[in-house]
């Protein structure tokens, strides 16, 4: 949940959906 991306892809080790921290 720490890795953020504008593409809404799973980047962190937990597999949390990123895309909110742009």
Curated annotation (Swiss-Prot):
PROSITE patterns: NATRIURETIC_PEPTIDE. Keywords: Disulfide bond, Hormone, Secreted, Vasoactive. It is found in: Secreted. GO terms for biological process: blood vessel diameter maintenance; cGMP biosynthetic process; growth plate cartilage chondrocyte differentiation; growth plate cartilage chondrocyte proliferation; receptor guanylyl cyclase signaling pathway. Belongs to the natriuretic peptide family. Hormone which plays a role in endochondral ossification through regulation of cartilaginous growth plate chondrocytes proliferation and differentiation. May also be vasoactive and natriuretic. Specifically binds and stimulates the cGMP production of the NPR2 receptor. Binds the clearance receptor NPR3. This is C-type natriuretic peptide.
